[in-house]
Amino acid sequence: GNFATSSVARAMSSVPDVSNSIAVYYNNQTKTVDRETYIYTVLSSELYGKSYYTGKGLTSTQVSELYEAQAVAANTFLEYALSVYSNHSGKDYKVCSSSCCQVYDPTKVTEEAIDATANIFYTSGGKSKTDIVMYKPSSTTYDYIWGAFFSSCSGNGTKDHSTQPALKAVSCTDIATGAGGHRYGLCQMGAALRAKNGDSASNILLYYYTDCRIISCTLK
């Protein structure tokens, strides 16, 4: 999740529907995939494989919580790109396959990523649903957030974003030194340590995204 933006999301009085058809620019062409496929492909590309994290002392269940947190963050980032701001305005796609947006590489898909992503796509009340994080400072409004994430903060914590009220500075300790990053939103190495320490996916997300809730949206 690598583009910074000054675009401020609009406040809504109800939960929005989200598109199930995603156009992504990959391998020099625009491809259309369903949302779940897009998310598990991003998840496989943006995090290390399961063996890396079990090697750091996480149990299989803890790795699943980490993966699920990243899946929701990626879904949130995607919805912001579709509904609020994209680096690719005027194109027939809103997200590309590089770190300009979210890394998307179908050759790296793992079963663990598919399984974790399946947890955030489900049927409720006869409708297909998926989870994203939304800024919800009051009981009556919902705002999209830039679902930013990055590799590691090296123990320096995250930073305040000037126009994104959900992206506040929080303290953070990494499980290992990663590739660095912009320090906005979810720290992947910090999230791994929080998972190892027993945090659920939802607790990880709500730690890094301030005054937010995990919202169930209908796929359209």
Whereabouts are the PLM-identified features?
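Conserved, single-site charged/polar hotspot
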Residues: G1-K220
